[in-house]
Regions:
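PLP-dependent aminotransferase class I/II
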Residues: 1-114
Length: 114
């Protein structure tokens, strides 16, 4: 997926030690499909997706009444993550067949929109 034009895969820094619970990726503005189209295509084929809600935490309802500081220019990179990113499931019950199916659906989605 990382090699597909219009997609930016999640990544970590060398010194980061993480446990992946979801595989996140962003759909670039020049991608042949939108986040909504990707969600609908995959959902129709039984692949669950979730929006990446952590992009701009200040846009979450729970932060509406909490005092905070933010730049006058806003947080455009955080907003972009929130608006254009999706995550795919990763958990201990997925087996090789499940992962293969998810990958096949991603390939079919790409072929459908290009």
């Amino acid at each position: 997926m990382a090699s597909r034009e219009g997609i930016t895969s999640g990544r970590t820094q060398k010194e980061t030690d993480t446990t992946w619970m979801r595989f996140c990726f962003s759909i670039d503005e020049d991608a042949p499909f939108t986040r909504t189209q990707a969600q609908e295509f995959l959902a129709d084929r039984g692949v669950s997706t979730r929006m990446v809600w952590t992009g701009n935490i200040l846009r979450q309802p729970g932060f509406a009444s909490i005092d905070h500081r933010s730049p006058d220019t806003g947080l455009p990179n955080c907003d972009r993550m929130m608006e254009r990113s999706l995550s795919l499931p990763i958990h201990h019950r997925l087996n090789a067949d499940h992962i293969g199916y998810i990958c096949e659906q991603l390939d079919q989605m790409w072929e459908h929109y290009t």
